Amino acid sequence: MLCISVEEFLFWKKKQLSKGGDQPSFDFLLDCIGGISSSDLNLKSLNPNEDIHLKKNLEFLGSVWDDHLLKSCPIQYLCGITFWRDLKLKVTKKVLIPRPETELIVDIVFNIFRKKSEKLFFAELGTG
């Protein structure tokens, strides 16, 4: 595990984000590969003299971020996982990444059919 000061890490993070990309994708990378969640990072940021413990070094994390930016590859493919509802799913480039809108559709269907007494079965066909 790599130990780095919060101050040094925040400087590195700002430099990475200045290359492009969006904050949620970068946070996803840090959580999945770096081993630090955005909420933990926010707490650590309150005290720049503290240290952050990462699963991977900054050079590796930066190279994954560069791949994301240069190849326009979804961060979920590079991390090898994605989240859908309460599931953590393994993904590769051979599968489609679940869309956030699908979670919303499931919530709407559950709300409509929640009061039905009969047991209902649904299938999402993942037609892309």
Predicted features, each with a name:
Residues 63-128:
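SAM-dependent Rossmann-like transferase core, predominantly class I methyltransferases
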Residues 1-79:
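N-terminal auxiliary segments of SAM/dcSAM-dependent transferases
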